[in-house]
């Protein structure tokens, strides 16, 4: 059984920020690379004062220039490091795992040095632009999730620029009601189609699901600006791709564009999903249908704002019947970072169901069993009631528990607790369904993507932090894992030999080949 490379714990509270002033929150590492203090601004919370999850806070000046080293190129080799000082007794060094560039947003991903089960995210918009003036809509997003505690920074309104830093206990965040099972009555009586014999996604042929993401004016109001919403959407994109990779699913989503829906009606997720799914609905559905037709994307998701309600809704194929009309999801803005909800709602588009306890509460007569796409396509709550998979609900735990950013898989464990069994294995199902959903439509616009061919000799294996093919400029971390009695001897990158380090980072400026060479220890 494989322990999680990064068990994503509970709520990764990513926050958007509008700018920074002079706080060297991040200092240079031994690599000679320096970075800056993160500053984040989230939606000015309407009246939400601090909840019980906030343990302490402080306000500091911020400086934008310190972040610009994150805009520099990344050479092949061992990952770079940055040190963050959140409080006098809270300093951490983060190891670089990847960089994604999406329509002007650069998202830096990493983990705490020596703690691959943690996550540190820095997202930049407008910071890497050249010139002496600060562009409008500059956004920085930063979060450090150590599991039991989460640190984040949030910019405050006004000038000079200042930021609020908080330490939070995610276990004290309030639970939200499960989303409804978005299944039509006719689908429940349709003939069953077996997925047996379907070609699964593989590391040699990973699936890419193309997505366009919309958002509502209420989401913009909640976030503070449209740029902050877009920033957080790309943060959530990275998190879902990590969830797929960490669950052994060779697939990814690619959000090729975003748009403001202009929708000012009821933001309740079930209402919006019904409208979004209807191509004749003039408020949401007709625009979504037109975007799919024009761009050839597989899925449409829309970010709304419904504090205190069900945090999303996603089209759910049932009984093995996948159809490109089942291509829509609605996700609450706060839930994107609160509990990885983009991966949950799009997980429904992949045919993945909740955990069995939640399903039994939602459908007490047990008829949900007949809707499953495979007998094992359900989420998981660990036997110690402390962790759930991405499709399960913490509200169904019998004690406070954390949602991990992975799909149920009996081959994964956290703190010795299996994250699935043979009857609850959403990752296995996703390996079958991601190629189906990726084949709903074919892109009608040019989209350059580069392949990274990974190889290894006998005696070990390699895997990327997220699967490709990759957009130009993406930085991908690749990790080597020796088998028992073996060790890593060298990396061969595009025909050149490099020394052995457990992790190397590759910049996808072209197609590349990387091979790990293992020898007996």
Give the predicted meaning of each segment.
Residues 449-454, 502-521:
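Conserved "repeat-terminator" motif of extracellular CCP/Sushi domains
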Residues 453-468, 497:
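Short, solvent-exposed loop/edge segments of extracellular or virion-exposed proteins
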Residues 39-43, 51-54, 164-320:
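Fold-level signature of zinc-dependent metallopeptidase catalytic domains
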Residues 258-275, 323-408:
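The catalytic-center signature of Zn2+-dependent metalloproteases
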Residues 1-8:
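N-terminal secretory signal peptides that target proteins for export/translocation
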Residues 474-502:
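Surface-exposed interfaces of beta-sheet-rich extracellular modules
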Residues 13-15, 20, 25-147, 278-280:
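N-terminal prosegments of processed precursors
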Residues 410-449, 514-519:
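A recurrent domain-boundary module in secreted/ectodomain proteins
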